[in-house]
Regions:
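Generic helix N-cap/helix-start motif at coil->alpha-helix transitions
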Residues: 29-30, 42-50, 76-84, 113-115
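Conserved positions within tetratricopeptide repeat
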Residues: 49-52, 64, 83-86, 98, ...
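Hydrophobic/aromatic side-chain positions at a characteristic register within alpha-helices
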Residues: 40-43, 126
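Cysteine-centered motifs
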Residues: 1-2, 11
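C-terminal-biased regions
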Residues: 89-90, 97-104, 108-116, 120, ...
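Short helix-adjacent coil turns
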Residues: 128-134
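Structural detector for internal amphipathic alpha-helices that build alpha-solenoid repeat scaffolds
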Residues: 20-26, 49-58, 80-92
Length: 212
């Protein structure tokens, strides 16, 4: 949630709240669960956001579908609707969610690493909405990708990014976007930073990392 001292943030928060409240609950609750998931996956951005609460309310039906609840989504993609479906099942039906995936599963979203990094702990943290843990994993992974010097000093220089494996950066970015309703990720924050004139002091409040 954006701090109220940021006028732009307030406007965005109000917009999201209105979209949230605009959900036609009487209509969406009469959809079959398959129809609901179809609209949640293919509807307009505003329609999808208006169905967020309904999807969570019908998690019992979704969990009964098992792995098929995600059959209309692409595991190579970054669709936050798929991420949300996984998160609400983790919130309310964790045992059923575990049964839907094999014991040796690497997570529903496919991940790629050129240096052998295991992204399963990262996906587990994001599915469980343990975002601080996910952030620590991200920071640690970036240092690892940058090399021994970055690991020793504890942070990454901008100049080191160009030498990082692209597949790993894409994987981190995809998973953040998929499990944050499209609000977080390197590409999302870069776009937002550009809209703020490159000012980090304005970025931190907008993404909820700092309140004025």
């Amino acid at each position: 949630c954006c701090p109220i001292s940021d006028i732009v943030g307030v406007c965005l928060a109000i917009r999201d709240w209105l979209l949230f409240m605009s959900s036609d609950k009487s209509y969406s609750t009469h959809l079959s669960i398959e129809e609901l998931l179809e609209q949640f996956s293919k509807g307009s951005s505003s329609k999808r956001r208006s169905l967020i609460r309904t999807v969570e309310e019908r998690v019992d039906e979704i969990s009964l579908l098992g792995y098929d609840s995600l059959s209309i989504f692409d595991p190579e993609g970054d669709d936050w609707a798929a991420g949300w479906i996984l998160q609400v099942q983790q919130r309310h039906k964790p045992d059923e969610l575990r049964k839907s995936f094999s014991v040796d599963s690497k997570g529903w979203f496919k991940t790629h690493s050129l240096v052998g990094i295991d992204y399963l702990p990262f996906q587990k943290a994001l599915i469980s909405e343990s975002f601080e843990e996910a952030d620590r994993f991200t920071s640690s992974t970036l240092r690892q990708l940058a090399g021994e010097a970055a690991e020793s000093r504890g942070y990454v220089y901008f100049s080191e990014v160009k030498n990082m494996p692209g597949d790993d950066l894409v994987t981190l970015d995809r998973l953040w976007r998929a499990y944050s309703q499209g609000r977080f990720g390197f590409s999302v924050q870069a776009k937002l930073l550009g809209s703020l004139g490159g000012r980090y002091d304005r970025l931190w409040p907008r993404i909820g990392w700092k309140e004025d």
